Amino acid sequence: LISSILNFKTAIQEQNSFPGYTNRLLSKRVKLIFVAYNNLEKIFDNNNVLNLGNPIRKYNINTNQDPFNYFNLDENKKTILVLGGSLGAKSINEGILNNLSIIRESSFQVLWQTGDYYYDHILSKKIEEKNLVIKSFIKRMDLAYKVADIIISRAGAIAISELSYISKPLILIPSPNVVDDHQRKNANEIFRNGGCLLVEDKDAKDNMLNQAINLLDNSEMKIKMKKSLGKLAKPDAAKNIVSKIYEQI
């Protein structure tokens, strides 16, 4: 705000599908607005709205390292990757804990990032399912993405941008504990474009795994999701944003 008052050339970046109050306020005073979703020019009172995507880390999922060996997984089984962020997500973790009997009898396997906050509690359950690999945090996300046939995740802005780039079939469970309900709005936008299934946080405990199992067996839907996510992906967002900024200097 001070920069614009002093007549410096300024820009903002809105990462979510619906802008927060601060960016809506600043949008009236900045030179450029970078966004990651379509139709935000209707919300911002500014003609210079550019949809260049969110800057992400570009993982190389074509690495030669064997990801199944790294995670001690069976390369002949379909894999569900479950992510709840670095701290974890209670509802997503309950969606696994409450369905251990289904996992035990299944032909698929699960790579489960519990988050640091829930890890010790989950280990105390002494889970012994051979087709369930439990991690507090996954450092090698490139390998995790490579083994995944489908991914279950929260719906943060950067997570969605990264998952669009990866373009694996996706189930999003937006957190209800986010200012302006950004995660739900983000997830709805991806769902509207055919890039994911959407499970409400309150339903994850009972419905999440069933949705994942059904998706594993639905080849047509998986192909559609991959194509939709690929169209939404903007892997060169960081470079393109910087280039536009340099043009203004």
Feature annotation, model-predicted:
Residues 234-249:
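C-terminal alpha-helical cap of glycosyltransferases
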Residues 221-235:
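A short, well-ordered alpha-helix in the C-terminal region of glycosyltransferases
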Residues 197-203, 214-219:
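Conserved acidic donor-binding segment of nucleotide-sugar-dependent glycosyltransferases
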Residues 212, 216-220, 245-249:
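Short, hydrophobic alpha-helical segments
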